[in-house]
Amino acid sequence: MSSIKKISFVGIFSALATLVMFLEFPIFPQASFLKYDPSEIPALIVSFLLGPGVGMFVVLVKDILFFLMKSGDPVGIAMNAVLGMSFVGIAGLIYHRNKSRATAIKGMIVATLFATAFALGLNALIVPLYFEAPFELYLKFFPFILAFNLVKFGIDSVVTFFVYKKVSSILKLETVEGRSNNG
């Protein structure tokens, strides 16, 4: 793929990720600040196609654009960026070591578990500071944070798994099985 095509592809997927980030909704009414959006899906596709660094770049671009357009919450958007980059980066890194369907699944599972554990740790630090609340508030939200992140990254993984092959075939790039269509 030429440099111009890669730049165009990254731009299109960054814009797509930004747009779908507006489709946010809370999963748990008791923790309405935890909002699901499917914006890591385009970034994960890019990570599988072009590498983990490029996928992480898409996450960063979409979070900056979303912050500038809608979010007045720098802490929430920063956490979203850090967690999204860890998820997309780890999944892409594992996949690129041995491009296969099994490795893609393994990468997404490991990335989901890592990003969820990372979210729990970040929230343990941020919730008491951001909400100026005691650590007990974090403990109250712990089950929701755990479940939310498993669901979020799980949905992103499942959708990516089923969409990636079609997208890569359309673009005539590498498929999940590792075959190269670009000679």
UniProtKB/Swiss-Prot annotation:
Main location: membrane
Pfam family, one: ECF_trnsprt
Transmembrane spans: 9-29, 41-61, 75-95, 109-129, 144-164
Any one GO CC term of the record: plasma membrane
Molecular functions per Gene Ontology: riboflavin transmembrane transporter activity
Compartmental location: Cell inner membrane
Transferase as UniProt keyword: no
Superkingdom to which the source organism belongs: Bacteria
Entry annotated with the keyword NADP: no
Membrane topology of this protein: Multi-pass membrane protein
GO annotation terms (biological process): riboflavin transport
InterPro entries named in the record: ECF_trnsprt_substrate-spec, RibU
Signal peptide: none
Annotated keywords: Cell inner membrane, Cell membrane, Membrane, Transmembrane, Transmembrane helix, Transport
Protein purpose: Substrate-binding (S) component of an energy-coupling factor (ECF) ABC-transporter complex. Mediates riboflavin uptake, may also transport FMN and roseoflavin. Probably a riboflavin-binding protein that interacts with the energy-coupling factor (ECF) ABC-transporter complex. Unlike classic ABC transporters this ECF transporter provides the energy necessary to transport a number of different substrates. The substrates themselves are bound by transmembrane, not extracytoplasmic soluble proteins.
Assembly with partners or alone: Forms a stable energy-coupling factor (ECF) transporter complex composed of 2 membrane-embedded substrate-binding proteins (S component, RibU, BioY), 2 ATP-binding proteins (A component) and 2 transmembrane proteins (T component) upon coexpression in E.coli. A stable subcomplex with both A and T components are also isolated. This complex interacts with at least 2 substrate-specific components, BioY and RibU.
Family from the record: Belongs to the prokaryotic riboflavin transporter (P-RFT) (TC 2.A.87) family.
Name of the featured protein: Riboflavin transporter RibU
Native organism: Thermotoga maritima (strain ATCC 43589 / DSM 3109 / JCM 10099 / NBRC 100826 / MSB8)
